[in-house]
């Protein structure tokens, strides 16, 4: 079976599957009882095609708009521009001077002419009653007016499905419809023959069973939909920095309004259409909106920023002009939201299993019906009544047909693929409580197969709460942890050096020191920037004073490829100076001078270089992150087109930043090792720092290899083949090094790789990995969008929790499949053999519907929602090549099926003698006993299925309230069916002895299951 599944249903990958692969497996699933329900959690490929068409249209539209705006720019200044634009009265009364349609046409149409008519960005700022310095007012009344005129920043979504819609979808089941038709005919014929109410019992029994199945199914599906709705709401929680009422603050992107001033940096997604106000080196990736991969430069000359695009480089301030469904992104997202998520490989595989078993079931159903009809025909031939059909015989034919249809109901395990969704929804909800947000359903199951985790250091293995604890300035290396130590340090070095140091810290930064609510000083920026700015303040520096004394004219933001950040500032008397900071060795290599202990600039000779490198090594060996700060005197002239100097710098000094290892990381790494998962650290930090942290975390062992990115890049494929299995630390790595490592692990070594990332440049590695894990706190929006799981607390221990839940999902589905296939096999064979040998089916349509509900909806609820056990992380991972239906499962399925078949067959052949049954009701009593024993076999088999290999199946059973509730409901309802609903279910009340025998024979399946688990089989 596994080879058939891999061949026909193996094209669908955990991520990035082609539409052709998604389409192909659907065509193979031709035995589907209820397409609406079966394919509810699969991608809507037609909606995706529609979204792609919108992208292509956008690409052409914006290309034309850019060409037109470029042509207009050549003569726009020479024209006397006038506008025929008429301001709507309601907009004027609200206090604004431009309407939303006019605003939208400016940015979407890249219309420089209209922008010029309205006075440029400054003119629009006034017309929107806002200010670049202060932003909009936060007064509730004013915000309400703004929302009323310009709309809110939300796109139209499909309305939530109500419970009754799920009931309607459950009723679309073809087999249930056929059974309903049978029930209707049975009602009519029965009432005509036997009158009301006796003649209606059979028909009403089937109707009641159908309604019960429908309502239980709808309730389960509705609960799942609510869980997914909660998860979708979590995915959409994105915040952005804005200025409102002169205060820099964070708000949800859905609260943005036209007139807001938004602060954007590398990796941010642009949350609305807007105009560039000011910024440096801004490159925008518009591929998500237009499909165009080439980044677009944005500046005062080309100021248009489109919602949904991403900041690839640089930083800027933006004026929001258009929000929500007025933007092209809003329209695209409204379409994409209906496209749905890709189905997971496990869902597809189980659709394959359902299809195979469905075909077998259909074959058995047809044969069973044919055998039953043949038996009736033979009887009529013996009676010589070929052409005379009584009402009883017609009812028998109808019952045979209903039994055949119900065999299909039981045989087509529609619940298999849906159990995956149920289990994933349950796991995802629980993982949210454990600080992990799953964006891609498949990641949940794939994480259970992970064999390697490539983890960042900063913020994942460490706390990301950084402080400067050591510094070497003017040849003096001292501890500077705390304001007192920092002030003492500052007093011991020349004032000129302190001034240069503060200028470097406060001007060459992506952070900012602002006054927040309640006049509290607040530092905004990355943890590294925050640590440096805090150090600057503790040295007695004044951020605003230093910033106002110079003018920043060019910025090259930090990125993980260059490993440095640079600015050019203009000082009084038109003198230009460049400041640079970054990875210590890299920045130091670009220096040829340094500041000595007297504050003088002197050449950086071999002795001084060696001294500084020793300081870097010393700091790094103490697990400190080291940064080098340097400056370069440019002179009186600097062109904005010119690059920031790359060499000839003067070293100001080295700082050592403490970033402590997170509590519990060492234990989590040990858990990974015991689970057969290799943890590798991939960091941009210094090799010595990386090794110190890796040893502290338990990642780097005595026989492990630590290497730098540049050296890794130089290795040949043959060398990498020997190196990678022992590689535990990669330092000074670029994002492409991480991408290469992930690719080689997946292709060369067939590993299932999980990788963490936080920066924009990590997107390729996150995309390449089997499971991309983005950091929720330090991660950029670009990284989060490329990831499959967002680690909300940036903690490595949470990654281990995700792996544990992933394994739990995989094993829970295996348990459910094992349980369901056992019921399938027994129900099919019992009815088929009985029909062939006795001419009767012991399990009626109503009884089979109840069995179907036990094994389908209730079974999935019980087994697919088992919480993970700690010993899950003591097993080896399944890996890339593991079979889903393992040898262990086949052993359990076949052994348990054989036991149940032997019991039921003995009852059918010897049951009357064994129980002393005679009289007119003996057949009914025997069939009731068979039905009762069959159900109790499934109840106890459900308990046995909690563990596929362990004998102790009761561990933690009382903690799983869902499991206990399902078992209790099953037993209670079974008693009601036997004792009270016999008229409808074709059963008769049993005496105490018969009940005890039913329970004992069902229970004996557990020792049988335990004995089976002692039979050794290969794991796959």
UniProtKB/Swiss-Prot annotation:
Function: This magnesium-dependent enzyme catalyzes the hydrolysis of ATP coupled with the translocation of calcium from the cytosol out of the cell or into organelles.
Parts of the chain on the Lumenal side: 184-201, 371-400, 833-843, 908-919, 982-991
Entry-annotated residues carrying Phosphoserine: 46
Tissue specificity comment: Expressed at higher levels in roots than in leaves.
Organism encoding this protein: Arabidopsis thaliana (Mouse-ear cress)
Reactions performed catalytically: Ca(2+)(in) + ATP + H2O = Ca(2+)(out) + ADP + phosphate + H(+)
Residues at the catalytic site: 456 (4-aspartylphosphate intermediate)
Binding site for Mg(2+): 758, 762
Compartment annotation: Plastid, Chloroplast inner membrane
A Gene Ontology cellular-component term: chloroplast inner membrane
Sites of N-acetylmethionine modification: 1
Region of interest called Interaction with calmodulin, as start-end residue ranges on this chain: 21-32
Keywords: Acetylation, ATP-binding, Calcium, Calcium transport, Calmodulin-binding, Chloroplast, Ion transport, Magnesium, Membrane, Metal-binding, Nucleotide-binding, Phosphoprotein, Plastid, Plastid inner membrane, Translocase, Transmembrane, Transmembrane helix, Transport
Annotated gene: ACA1
GO MF annotation terms: ATP binding; ATP hydrolysis activity; calcium channel activity; calmodulin binding; metal ion binding; P-type calcium transporter activity
Disulfide linkage: none
Protein name: Calcium-transporting ATPase 1
Stromal compartment residues: 1-162, 223-350, 419-813, 865-884, 942-959, 1014-1020
Topological relation to the membrane, as annotated: Multi-pass membrane protein
Lineage, uppermost ranks: Eukaryota, Viridiplantae, Streptophyta, Embryophyta, Tracheophyta
UniProt record similarity statement: Belongs to the cation transport ATPase (P-type) (TC 3.A.3) family. Type IIB subfamily.
Documented EC number(s): 7.2.2.10
Gene3D superfamilies: 1.20.5.170, Calcium-transporting ATPase, cytoplasmic domain N, Calcium-transporting ATPase, cytoplasmic transduction domain A, Calcium-transporting ATPase, transmembrane domain, HAD superfamily/HAD-like
